[in-house]
């Protein structure tokens, strides 16, 4: 932000301490008014014709901006991504155990990446892996949405599940 003597414009549209528009005044007059109030002259929009400046306590303004930014960072929700690895030939009980883990992660609000690693000649039976992933998505459909459908990446096939949003929960 540009403030006080660093302002290059000869005239500025001045906004007073109380937020009321004073009008278009010379830079020197605006600086004098700011000095009389023992505050700073801050250039808000330098590209406007004439540029808009406001009389305010810049230190307090910067503190408020930092506080808002910190609050926004705190309110951001970081999505954890958990990974569950399966084999293309997984059987009943093992599948159920992995499904239980997927459900637990989804209820805690984490995204889940379900992956299948094809070893050796198993890569020739990609359809088996796809069936297992589709079955997993189907079984967890009451708690999740499919973000990415089963797709190959090197020797692995994966599927991404995200927990249902509040809107989606109401639909189901």
Curated annotation (Swiss-Prot):
UniProt keywords, alphabetically: Cytoplasm, Initiation factor, Protein biosynthesis
InterPro entries named in the record: T_IF-3_C_sf, T_IF-3_N_sf, Translation_initiation_fac3_CS, Translation_initiation_fac_3, Translation_initiation_fac_3_C, Translation_initiation_fac_3_N
UniProt keyword annotation of Cytoplasm present: yes
One Gene Ontology cellular component: cytosol
Entry-linked Gene3D superfamilies: Translation initiation factor 3 (IF-3), C-terminal domain, Translation initiation factor 3 (IF-3), N-terminal domain
GO molecular function: ribosome binding; translation initiation factor activity
Family per record: Belongs to the IF-3 family.
Known partners and oligomeric status: Monomer.
PANTHER family: TRANSLATION INITIATION FACTOR IF-3 (PTHR10938), TRANSLATION INITIATION FACTOR IF-3, MITOCHONDRIAL (PTHR10938:SF0)
Name of the protein in question: Translation initiation factor IF-3
Species in which this protein is naturally found: Lactobacillus johnsonii (strain CNCM I-12250 / La1 / NCC 533)
Gene name as annotated: infC
């Amino acid at each position: 932000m540009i403030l006080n003597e660093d302002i290059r414009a000869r005239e500025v549209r001045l906004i007073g301490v109380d937020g009321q528009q004073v009008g278009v005044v010379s830079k020197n007059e605006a600086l004098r008014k700011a000095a009389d109030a023992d505050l700073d002259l801050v250039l808000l929009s330098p590209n406007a014709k004439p540029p808009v400046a406001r009389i305010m306590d810049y230190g307090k303004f910067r503190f408020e901006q930092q506080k808002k930014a910190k609050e926004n960072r705190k309110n951001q929700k970081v999505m954890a991504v958990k990974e569950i690895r399966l084999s293309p030939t997984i059987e009943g009980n093992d599948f159920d155990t992995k499904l239980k883990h997927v459900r637990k992660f989804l209820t805690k609000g984490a995204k889940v990446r379900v992956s299948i690693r094809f070893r050796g000649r198993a890569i020739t039976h990609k359809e088996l892996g796809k069936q297992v992933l589709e079955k997993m998505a189907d079984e967890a459909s009451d708690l999740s949405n499919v973000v990415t459908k089963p797709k190959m990446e090197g020797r692995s096939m994966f599927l991404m599940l995200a927990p249902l949003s509040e809107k989606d929960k109401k639909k189901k």
